[in-house]
Amino acid sequence: MFALGALLDPITSHAAPAPFEPSAAGSTLPNRLTGSFVSAARGGVKTNWVIALPPGQKAEAGSLRPVIALHGKDGDANMMLDCGVEKALAQLVREGKPPFAVVGVDGGANSYWHRRASGEDPGAMVLDELLPLLSSMGFDTTRVGFLGWSMGGYGALHLGAKLGPSRTAGICAISPALYTSFTASEAGAFDSYDDWVQNSVVGLPALNAIPLRVDCGTFDRFYFAARQFVSQLKTPPAGSFSLGGHDIGYWRTQLPGELAWMAT
């Protein structure tokens, strides 16, 4: 997805990120960076981030682009590491694929990555705080990718569409937590019927103009909703509906192919 290069206007930041706290320096070219910042969009909450770098790469060159990895319910910034991101990035380097970084960030246990009635807005945290922070660290954020698991799969679709086709290089939604109705949604996923309607990803024009990949197991509880979502797209997305459930085992087996797709 990062081969789709173009000169793009940078996003306008509505709130500059608070100073981040980088981890202690390790090797000359570390494969992992960690830190945190206080997110105004999340109500002043300390927000941790983790960056997985492909071996031999660094952000300072200004050419490394990020894929934002959004965790599922009750997860955190480290979920992408549990899914095997570092091993998959190393494999891409061995195969000579274009390198990119994968960035995990805390979004809240049950936030569903959109503005809530409480005022907390993890989506704004990603777009208005995290992306400018990554830019200040030397990453090329003119175009970024999104991927996510479960709640984060929905979030990847939601935030990728919100950022728009000019900035979003690709979206990979893995076992996305999609609901065919408000009454079918999990308690706490949306604040009200109006909240569900306003933040639905079905029928969004932007998602027909952004490269998409959707993977979901046939035994996943979100299988039918994911099928319905895919069926209403103008162009069939990449990905597959294959044997598997809503679990880390399925996500680990799918990740190498998903990151290889992001690299194309």
Residue ranges and their predicted role:
Residues 2-264:
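Non-catalytic cap/lid and distal C-terminal segments of serine-dependent acyl enzymes
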